[in-house]
């Protein structure tokens, strides 16, 4: 049953996320704006403007006080989730920012880029701490492990990489998708990784060994988004 339809954007919406307490929803759109919605009523509470091109990815900070956004305008912006004010703009990118995520402790931001790299940023200073090189195509999805010690990234080239979040070293490369990887996520306990791909499949991987445990088939087109349920027993895909 569809409970709500949130209308307000004037272009497609490539990214949505719930606030940690579940009371709000944030959406990023091709209309260059970010909207904050009341999750219960569906009312648009705020429209955040400042990006010059499409907003590709949005995420809440773990404490729910901030929102980050990545855009085709080659910037990441940090916003105050209550006031809607832009607190910081992280610059220095040469390509689109396709994916953003917070570390579990909220002190770092990671971004996946059109230049085949992943960047790690300090949220307080706005300084780029590390650039992770190794992918051979756009990095479409990034995520931290629940304990914050590892980073995963999925590339349009078809590979998934596991990185040491402190050193930036590539620990493993997971290969098995026949086309680009559009979405990656860790299980809540950090033992598994799921990936959605242009090859219409979802794969479940062992996060320690890198072994592909299962391939889930059933979609008739590409899988652009995957996520685990909070208890780790279910997977949703779109």
What is each stretch, according to the model?
Residues 1-238:
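A detector of tandem-repeat and repeat-rich interaction/domain scaffolds
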